[in-house]
Amino acid sequence: MKKFIILLSLLILLPLTAASKPLIPIMKTLFTDVTGTVPDAEEIAHKAELFRQQTGIAPFIVVLPDINNEASLRQNGKAMLAHASSSLSDVKGSVLLLFTTREPRLIMITNGQVESGLDDKHLGLLIENHTLAYLNADLWYQGINNALAVLQAQILKQSTPPLTYYPHPGQQHENAPPGSTNTLGFIAWAATFILFSRIFYYTTRFIYALKFAVAMTIANMGYQALCLYIDNSFAITRISPLWAGLIGVCTFIAALLLTSKR
């Protein structure tokens, strides 16, 4: 009898517990990712803050695995947004951009004076159509940035921007030759230039310039390999012979012009 009463109590309390669970996490900041899917969260939060300053609308971006009750979310979303934005100053409205990762999609809810000319559902579909290709390819950073750009254009009554690739902060120089963006690289090459100029000084002018150029070319390739090794990304294919060759040619010309001997 006692076990039956306990079981009955659990059956009664479980639905109440499930009902009390919030639909989405409390939005304490402009960007919330409970899945850990989106890289560079700080950069996206910064973009959201810029969006708020430029439009007067606070964008709350939330990334969840899935949403269980979309109807309830749309019904209570405005109240959630009002509560989340109550601590923010100089905002005339707020918008929720809810991204789901299990089945990539976007749900959008607005609150306040968000003047876009479209209702929430149609505005959300417009933004989703411009970002879904990125989301399906797991390019969440790109998708969220494009979503903010399209939404901002709608609010400010501007033309819809084209799809844009937004490089991650760490990808600004990803196509540059290894070590070429390192400040210490200039110091290393200056020291190498001085060293080789003394080593090859006691030869004829042409041989001096040729040896100097070959040595600087080989040293550059070694320097690239060292930078890749330190960065734990060493691969022969990532070493740029073109950059090394350019260093060699420039060295050869400089040696011919700066050397006064025959």
From Swiss-Prot:
Record key words, sorted: Cell inner membrane, Cell membrane, Membrane, Transmembrane, Transmembrane helix
Record localization: Cell inner membrane
A GO cellular-component term linked to this record: plasma membrane
Family annotation (Pfam families): TPM_phosphatase
Sequence intervals crossing the membrane: 5-27, 183-202, 207-229, 239-258
Membrane topology classification: Multi-pass membrane protein
Main location, first listed in the record: membrane
Periplasmic side: 28-182, 230-238
Topological domains, Cytoplasmic: 1-4, 203-206, 259-262
Name of the protein in its database record: Inner membrane protein YcfZ
Natural source organism: Escherichia coli (strain K12)
Source organism phylogeny: Bacteria, Pseudomonadati, Pseudomonadota, Gammaproteobacteria, Enterobacterales
Gene symbol of the encoding locus: ycfZ
